[in-house]
Amino acid sequence: MQEIRGVVFDLYGTLCDVHSVAQLCGQYFPERGTEISLMWRQKQLEYSWLRSLMGQYVSFPQATEDALVFVCNALNLKLREDTRIALCNEYLNIKPYREVRSALESLRSGAVPLAILSNGSAHSIQSVVGNAGIEHFFSHLISADEVSVSKPSPAAYELAEKRLKVVRSKLLFVSSNAWDASGARHFGFQVCWVNRSRNTFEQLGERPDHVISGLDELPNLLNFASADR
């Protein structure tokens, strides 16, 4: 592995499980929770990308809300205002994956900065990591809102390079989203793809430098594991 001077994480789906919202979805719409969550996430991503391409950028929370409205319309589900608010707020409480805290603790011993680069708004990022109890691990929380364009735009990835003041080739970008890993590799980051579900990597002209099945493998990959492990 080349020299690493900083590690930058995606948030949604990498550190925290977006489909933890399925439980609350199922409370409001019995037996439809997983279906809603899967469709909601896909449409959320599509809207964030399409808005960027159209030059009509909206914040990730707005794209999330718009996506939920679409899903309920498509599934012929009546979405009350209080339900919409509750479900969108649940995106601020998505749960960290089980290995996240221990992995971050080990990585912190490596004495390189850890950062998050997300399409989420600054408020959303702060809320998610705060509610998950992992905010203290990160020196920078970076939102694509700052450039009004979503990942995988190079302009979004450039934010991390500028904020950490580290040349892109010496930053490791970690994401479970193959489209994100492709975009980051195209930008010039070293990339680690977290393939928890044994998915097939996207055919977008780029390949990750490393593939792991969970973040618990990352400390050993970087040789930053704490002495007591």
From Swiss-Prot:
Start and end residues of each stretch annotated as Important for catalytic activity: 175-180
Hydrolase listed as a keyword: yes
Disulfide pattern: none
Species annotation: Pseudomonas sp. (strain CBS-3)
EC primary class: hydrolase
Site (Important for catalytic activity): 14, 151, 157
EC number in record: 3.8.1.2
The protein's name in its UniProt record: (S)-2-haloacid dehalogenase 2
GO molecular function: (S)-2-haloacid dehalogenase activity
The keyword Lyase is assigned to this record: no
UniProt-listed InterPro entries: 2-HAD, HAD-like_sf, HAD-SF_hydro_IA, HAD_sf, PGP-like_dom2, S-2-haloacid_dehalogenase
Signal peptide start and end residues: none
Keywords in alphabetical order: Hydrolase
Family listed: Belongs to the HAD-like hydrolase superfamily. S-2-haloalkanoic acid dehalogenase family.
Active-site annotation: 10 (nucleophile)
Origin superkingdom: Bacteria
UniProt cross-references to NCBIfam families, sorted A to Z: HAD-SF-IA-v1 (TIGR01549), HAD-SF-IA-v2 (TIGR01493), HAD_type_II (TIGR01428)
Catalytic activity: an (S)-2-haloacid + H2O = a (2R)-2-hydroxycarboxylate + a halide anion + H(+); (S)-2-chloropropanoate + H2O = (R)-lactate + chloride + H(+)
Function description: Catalyzes the hydrolytic dehalogenation of small (S)-2-haloalkanoic acids to yield the corresponding (R)-2-hydroxyalkanoic acids. Active with 2-halogenated carboxylic acids and converts only the S-isomer (or L-isomer) of 2-chloropropionic acid with inversion of configuration to produce R-lactate (or D-isomer).
Binding sites annotated in the UniProt record for an (S)-2-haloacid: 11-12, 41, 118-119
